[in-house]
């Protein structure tokens, strides 16, 4: 150990001495090398600051180019993505357009092993069904879409177009006997939508004659256009001047419904129909509506019901006529069939024929046609045929009852005949009270004459108005008629008065009061306005009796008796046109 330590110490002692032993030449060489390195470093250090600026610029430009390329790359990616989507869409469109056409069929029933019985192309076929279609969910009569291989690939809706036929009867629950336009009978299946509907004979059905299916019940538009089902709101109290006629029709219509037990006890048959006849505008239609309203209320009270229900079938007479043979008769059958259905639960039903003479005129009187020869028997068979009319009342209205077929007017059909006459002075007062009510504004001067009593003022106004209308003075003279036997008679405006004319007079006076309020600012109705309205109303009617047949005009106007051959106007302040014979009268116009 001592020898080793001494050697290391000797080595340390000898190292510095060796460095100092280098020659000056060697040291000078090393100094030169170091000076060269220092000079080189100084040169590199001198040129280094000038080279960083271009590099920085290059770096900035490179970064900008990189950003621009990134943006372009993103835009290209979006464009390529959109182009790919468009290509896919175009491919789908091309594939869709390249597909073969699809056919349709009608589902009849489910077959074995997931097949379906389908009617397509005029044939009944058993077709395979796509797994996407559930056969159990298909309904009879439903439309199915078929591919080119006649495989059911989709369930569609039921058909909504086809032929309209009339139902004659339902056969065995899922089949029906229908009649077409040419009276061709056909048996069809009932589609699923009709299975839960209570069908009745006479219903209109939409059918597919090729597939043999009926799809839906079509509203009977021909009957809907002719029949207005309503519960009228007209009461007897709204009708003026017809107290006696109202009493007659109440005895004929209401008593059999309200006291049916007494009728059975006395073995008295209720009347089947009522004829209301008389001049136009005298309240025939109003009475018929009031009958329906009153009867409904009394029957409801008799049964202890709070709500009253009745049906008023208002038949538009002239629109019953149809150019096709048998169509008018069929419509009449449908109307009475509906009436029987409504009345089956004891609800009173009124079938109202307005202008009855236009449809049921005397057989054999037709000039250009003889439709009445079959229409009249159809009505007679409905009124007193095999099927009785329980709780159904037929009411007819006409101003030419002489033209209605006598078979309709005989007892047992239209049993009760009520004449609705033109109102006399007392009836006119009653009618005026329906339109001149205390709620109307009255002129202060007229009201002051009666001490502010509105009711007394209105009564006085009505009295003045009625006296002006019904006095037989020269200013109220209207016509001079000459009968076939040579007798002459002067007719006054009062002879042609009606409830409609009274309403028109009141309306004229009210309009005059409104115009006076606008001009003067004073509100209220005056008696002078009523008198002026009478003059205007008479002046408008003076030229109306100008029909070529005065005798026909007299029948409509309510003047019966000897045949009229001449008519001469006697209106004051107007030159007379002279007498007019039947064969010389011209310029036919409205009936008064």
UniProtKB/Swiss-Prot annotation:
Name one molecular function that GO assigns to this entry: ATP binding
Q: Does rRNA processing appear among the keywords?
A: no
Pathway listed: Protein degradation; proteasomal Pup-dependent pathway
Question: Which portions of the sequence form the region Docks into pockets in the proteasome alpha-ring?
Answer: 591-592
GO cellular component labels: proteasome complex
- The lineage's top-level taxon is Bacteria
Description of its domains: Consists of three main regions, an N-terminal coiled-coil domain that binds to protein Pup and functions as a docking station, an interdomain involved in ARC hexamerization, and a C-terminal ATPase domain of the AAA type.
Q: How does it assemble?
A: Homohexamer. Assembles into a hexameric ring structure that caps the 20S proteasome core. Strongly interacts with the prokaryotic ubiquitin-like protein Pup through a hydrophobic interface; the interacting region of ARC lies in its N-terminal coiled-coil domain. There is one Pup binding site per ARC hexamer ring. Upon ATP-binding, the C-terminus of ARC interacts with the alpha-rings of the proteasome core, possibly by binding to the intersubunit pockets.
The protein in question is named: Proteasome-associated ATPase
| Species for this entry | Nakamurella multipartita (strain ATCC 700099 / DSM 44233 / CIP 104796 / JCM 9543 / NBRC 105858 / Y-104)
